[in-house]
Amino acid sequence: MAGLLPRAYGGVLRRSYIYLGSQCSNSVSRLTVGSTFRLVRMKSWGTSKFHTNGSPVLNEIKKISKSNGITIINPLVNKVTTNNVSTSSNGKAAVAAATAATAVSLGSTGQDDALSRNTDFLHIQNILLQKNQDRMNKQKLLSEATNFYERFKINTKWLLIRGNRPFSADEIGTLFSWIILSQILWIILGTTTFVSILLIIFNTVFAKEMVGNVVGKLLNIFLDGIDVKFQDALVPEWRKGCIRFNNVQLRTHPLQASEPENINDYNELVNNMIEFDLKLHQIELSLSLKKWLLGNGLIQDLTIMGMRGNITVTPVSLENKIDDNQRVNLIDWFSNPYYHLGNVKVTDSSIILHDNQLSKDFKVSIYNLDMPQLRFQWIINDFLSSNVVDGSINHSLFNIHKRQHKLAYIKDLENDLSDWKRITRIRLDSIDVKKLGLNNSNAFNWMDDGQLDIIADVMLPNEQENEPDFDFTRNKKEHMSKSNNKYVVLDLKFRFKDLKAIFPDRAPRLSNGEEILSLDELKQIILFINRKYDLYHSYANSSYKNTLWDAPNIAINKAKSFPVTTVFQSKKDFSNEDSDEEDRKLKKQIIRFHDDISTPNNELVLSCKVVKNINELKNMVLFWETGIYDSLSMELYIDLMKMVEEWEYKKKTNWMTDWGSSVASQLIIVGFGAMV
């Protein structure tokens, strides 16, 4: 039984739902709330409006109801009483009309709300009954199934289409598209997991060594000039969420020697900048398809353990640049300079770094390195921002870490450091000058021997979250309102121990070939350093090797143009404990007319500060490319010249003071003699 009538409220035609009773007898048709209902969708009968009086549809309903003996008591309680009539076509139509009349609004707002509440309740009851019927049908089908395949088929179809009928063409297309989309989403969100499952499948089906060789050959296709070999299986590490490679070998292709006329070729210079032959005990990495789609590389996080091998670096100096507008940097060697890595860790590694520019070999050992990120365009900045770096250069320890404050860390201190992202402390302990290659450098070619300690505090500016590449030209007003700081400040202290100098063949020069100072000016520096060196060693030898040192009140006369009498007080043994204070006063010391020893260990301390724009570090891999070495050299020479001038002034002042006092004393004596 179905009744299709529109409902009008406020003169606007709308769709609605009515519920028709299905409980009819041969003699009586009665609609009650407790009857079984089913949902019938009402459709519009055109654009005619319903009114309480005068509507042709309402008049027709009344006429049919009256002819069949149906009396509408109250349309709001869904209760209709009928007279005893036989079920005929007119009776069915009358029941439909009477039931539809209960859904027609009579112009009262309260009556419409009550009817709406009743229909919602009946709608919910109908849904629950339908679900119960579907559940009974599913249980019946499962009980009739004879094996697992049939039960799986029934459950799958019931989950997808709520039935056991065959799939239609539209449903098959929908399922296929959803499978494809889910796989694409899985690859994007879980690239490492996807590749790990592929490796497990390949390792199961094929030999593990063959899988490693195939993967290595595929990588060689995409990596120009680099050979990759996997000597062991590729094992996914599920607990760490990464892929592990054991016994990996990386090697650059041997390049053929270029012809003499092609030495200045740009591509040839770039290809010969880096050569390496490395063996890695273990590599763990995770992948990210999102980074690869953005052009930042496929590898997300990287962990290297047990790296051994040789690396040869041939920097192209400014003197050998191709032209004035083209500069060759080490970043040009990388095929993708926009490569970004996430967390990078290197442990238990040792390599031999050969610098062709200095013709020196450096043995670099890395005990522990932890970098939160590594961007090829900002290698220097990211390296200085490392969480920790511990290692050694030619068996001299170095470390990079966040500087520890001597005072307690309070909120005021945090506000003072708000302009800086962090302050990094770099320390290099007791490295030999020759092993460091300073004697072969252009700027300090006069250094012959000695030890060097370096302490540097590097202050890095804050990095904007929306500007990871330090592009200060974009959103300039917004950036300048937050922070005006875009400079890197390096505060360095060089402590030379037992430094010895020789006269070089050519004057010190910067990386671009410009002279720092002339050879005549360099003579004063060499004289000052060697005088300190000779004085310290003569003092040490006389203290520990001279047998006359034990004799009291020894006077040493030296033939110089000015008095150089030096008095040493001998060390005496006192048995009386009360004389300890007097013993402390009787120290070996140099009295006047002699060059003072500034430090007991013959140390030469030079301090300097270098300020660099952060944008000048972009696309720079080596420090000498940034020009920091040239700035450091100039600052060190300025500080060294100040020390030499102070030493000469002090020596001259002491001589003039002594000469004046001696002449005055002689004049006084002569005067007294004349008076007598």
Curated annotation (Swiss-Prot):
The chain crosses the membrane at residues 184-204, 656-676. It holds the Pfam family MDM31_MDM32. The keyword Transit peptide applies. Residues 205-655 are mitochondrial intermembrane. It is a multi-pass membrane protein. Keywords: Membrane, Mitochondrion, Mitochondrion inner membrane, Transit peptide, Transmembrane, Transmembrane helix. The keyword Transcription regulation does not apply. Residues 1-17 form a transit peptide. GO terms for cellular component: mitochondrial inner membrane. Disulfide bonds: none annotated. InterPro entries: Mdm31/Mdm32. Coiled coil: none annotated. Residues 18-183 are mitochondrial matrix. Its main location: mitochondrion. One of its GO terms (biological process) is intracellular monoatomic ion homeostasis. It comes from the Eukaryota. It is found in: Mitochondrion inner membrane. Belongs to the MDM31/MDM32 family. Involved in the organization of the mitochondrial membranes and the global structure of the mitochondria. Also required for mitochondrial distribution and mobility as well as for the maintenance of mitochondrial DNA nucleoids structures. This is Mitochondrial distribution and morphology protein 32.
